[in-house]
A protein has these predicted regions:
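Helical scaffold of the NTase/Pol beta-like nucleotidyltransferase catalytic core
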Residues: 1-38
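Short, charge-rich amphipathic segments
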Residues: 1-11, 65, 137-145, 149
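Active-site nucleotide-donor binding segment shared across nucleotidyl transfer reactions
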Residues: 24-67
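Generic structural hydrophobic/aromatic packing signal, biased to beta-strands
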Residues: 28, 35-37, 73, 99, ...
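Short, charged/polar surface micro-motifs in flexible loops or helix N-caps
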Residues: 60-64, 106-107, 118-121
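Short amphipathic alpha-helices in soluble, non-transmembrane regions
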Residues: 66-75
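Conserved catalytic core of two-metal-ion nucleotidyltransferases
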Residues: 77-117
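Catalytic cores of NTP-dependent nucleotidyl/adenyl transfer enzymes across multiple folds
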Residues: 111-195
């Protein structure tokens, strides 16, 4: 079972290399934004799902400036697709960027960069969740989360927060327990959940 730990370490190391190679942070900083790593890479809980998640903050949302940062990122040869969604006039008050990156080994990585207006409803939420997870995570719970992510069939779609809530709040330690926990909590919103 040591293999899943090595896989997690290698994927997390590679994810951070990709951030540097593509100059994600620098591209957003060039427009005066603050880019914050969130999600499984920020908590050390990345396993098989190769996702790089960032929240990007500015005082105001400018489509033109957001496109300027995105164009710089898209110019990296590893970026093979980039999509944009304008959610400025919604409760989220954001501009979403979703990119696909092919690494040197041919593996596809998903990059989600959510450009958020400072002071909006979701300002800092993902960062608070990551901070709380980091504060309560033990070696045993970290190992349980990584093992569950590893054991999850690739055909099954489970968001990270489900694993974290199941293990950290629900005491789940095996895949059968995760399946039962998910069934018992089907329809529950994890928006606002903190350990």
């Amino acid at each position: 079972m040591e293999d899943y730990r090595k896989m997690a370490e290698a994927n997390q190391r590679r994810g951070r290399e990709i951030i540097a190679e593509t100059q994600l942070v620098e591209s957003w900083e060039a427009i005066g934004a603050q880019a914050t790593l969130i999600g499984s890479l920020s908590t050390g809980l990345m396993m098989k799902k190769l996702d790089i998640d960032m929240h990007v903050y500015t005082d105001t949302l400018s489509i033109k400036e957001s496109f300027r940062a995105a164009a710089r990122i898209a110019s990296h040869p590893g970026i093979v697709r980039m999509e944009y969604t304008n959610l400025i006039d919604t409760e989220e008050e954001c501009i979403e960027w979703h990119a696909a990156y092919r690494d040197r080994d041919g593996r596809m990585w998903k990059m989600d960069m959510i450009h958020i207006r400072r002071g909006s409803a979701y300002d800092g939420f993902a960062e608070r969740m990551a901070s709380r997870i980091g504060a309560v995570l033990t070696e045993e719970t970290r190992d349980a989360i990584l093992r569950l992510k590893y054991e999850t069939p690739d055909t099954e779609s489970i968001i990270g927060a489900e694993y974290y809530a199941a293990v950290l709040s629900g005491g789940v330690r095996d895949y059968a327990g995760l399946t039962a926990w998910r069934e018992a909590h089907r329809g529950d919103s994890l928006i606002g959940w903190l350990p």
